[in-house]
Design a protein with these regions (language model features):
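The feature encodes the CheY-like receiver
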Residues: 14, 59, 88
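Short hydrophobic/Thr-rich beta-strand motif most characteristic of the beta2 strand and flanking loop
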Residues: 27-35, 43
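Acidic catalytic/metal-coordinating carboxylates
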Residues: 36-39, 62-65
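Active-site residues of response regulator receiver
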Residues: 9, 55, 84
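A short, hydrophobic beta-strand element within the central beta-sheet of small alpha/beta folds
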Residues: 77-87
Length: 125
């Protein structure tokens, strides 16, 4: 089974970098990208992804609020990973508060971290 991934970030260079990480990770495929929190909620409903890579700081509603909205309206279980340039100690707890499965600093986002986070989150389903 291929994991359907949606990338949410307002910075095009990071969306491109995240796409490269996802596409080089076996069993993962990018199905869509969004630039704002509002757009991510609409697109998640339309595309029905398995996994959302969500930036914390977004124009309009922020990543944690968009995460809550996506989880409230999802048709099935969606795993959301929060990503940001902030340190894990600062934002790790916020990930849990909004329902995200994990927080990954952008500086350590890699195919290995993606696969590990997905495995951990999907094993608790």
């Amino acid at each position: 089974m291929t994991v359907r991934v949606m990338i949410v970030d307002d910075q095009a260079p990071f969306r491109l970098a995240a796409r490269m990480v996802v596409e080089t990770t076996d069993g993962f495929d990018v199905v869509g990208e969004a630039e704002t929190g509002e757009q991510s909620v609409e697109l998640a409903h339309e595309l029905d992804p398995d996994l959302v890579l969500m930036d914390v700081n977004l124009p309009g509603i922020d990543g944690p609020e968009a995460t809550r909205k996506i989880l409230e309206t999802a048709n099935h279980r969606v795993v959301i990973l929060l990503l940001s340039t902030y340190e894990e100690a600062e934002y790790g707890p916020r990930a849990a508060e909004c329902g995200a499965a994990a927080y990954i600093p952008k500086s350590s986002f890699s195919p290995e971290r993606l696969a590990e986070a997905w495995a951990a989150a999907s094993s608790t389903a």
